[in-house]
Amino acid sequence: VKLLLIGLDGVRADLALPELVAADPAFAAPDHPGDPRFSAPGGPGAAFGTPPATPVAPTLARLAAGGRLVPVWMTPPTDSGPGWASLLTGTTHEQNGVWWNEFVGHRLARCPDLLSQVFAADPRARTFAASTWPALVDASGPGPVVHQRPDQQVGGQHQLFAGTDVSDGCRSADRQVTTRAAWVLNHEGPDAAFVHLEGVDEAGHRAGAASAGYLAAISAVDEHVRHLVKAVAERFEQLGEDWLVAVTTDHGHRAEGGHGEDEVLVRRSFLLLHRLGGPLPAPLAALTSLRSEQVTPALLAAVGVRPASLETDHEVGVVRDVAPVGPTRDLRYEW
């Protein structure tokens, strides 16, 4: 099974797929408490907003109709850096050290992303990542979350693409990323791919989740998702390739815009799953609710990646220096 993970930044599930969210009790409230340091002044707030008068995400709805929508709950701080670091590496904020969008003090070098874990499981694997937010893929930025793996880049085995066309803000960058990603997916069919789009988050910050602009942004990225799914659907139709398509988000938005704290509307995420080529793999069919750090392990298990282990009697990864005391003159240790 090949994997396409699509990350839609800042999407409110209760507005994109209101009927499905309302029908699942696991979407109503977080399954674990938030960090009190990031408590919202007004408390957790309302659980749901006012659904749009007409559907805004037909592609997501079609994917869900042929697959399933799983609740995912983010752990505050509900910002993009901590959110994507957790979603893409399968680690908590404490483990990866990402607490802010500045990535100060991160430990991402020891927290490999989903694509790198696929490669580690089988070094023949071809991987691809494209992102509107450079911090996820660009080594010159504060991250990146996705490991660079330059040796694999040289031979085209690992490809990274960051959107640079900001002439129309994230909207133009999203179009650029989608165009590149759809071409690679359709013509090269990597074994695992991640595509990030940020237009909805930009709209949420500009006008808030209660605005017409926010709903229009959801519709725009939904159309981008359709292009990406079409790219791999053609490979399934012509080549018989089996594809697992997954869609997720890193946080929601308040009605007035913004996120970062522990309101229900910003902590709620989702994992939309759809398989081209058969029923969902058993590990995914049994899911009821996830936390952000459980998304990558669930997807890896579904495509056949098993966690590696190192069995040793020493503490791995710890740097310890010898004391500057000189030799003991014990002949057993003189060489």
What is each model feature region?
Residues 103-104, 111-112, 122, 136-139, ...:
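Membrane-interface soluble catalytic domains
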Residues 21, 141-145, 179-227:
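Active-site His/acidic residue clusters
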Residues 3-7, 14, 70-71, 86-88, ...:
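Structural recognition of the beta-strand scaffold that forms the well-ordered cores
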Residues 9-14, 76-79, 93-94, 133-138, ...:
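Solvent-exposed loop/turn segments at secondary-structure junctions
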Residues 15-28, 36-188, 295-301, 313-321:
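Active-site-proximal alpha/beta segments of enzymes that process anionic O-linked groups
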Residues 3-8, 13, 59, 217-264, ...:
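Metal-dependent active-site segment of extracytoplasmic phospho-/sulfohydrolases and closely related
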Residues 19, 99-100, 205-209, 282-284:
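Short acidic, glycine/proline-rich loop/turn micro-motifs
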Residues 20-26, 55-56, 210-213, 237, ...:
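Glycine-rich, phosphate-binding/catalytic loops in enzymes
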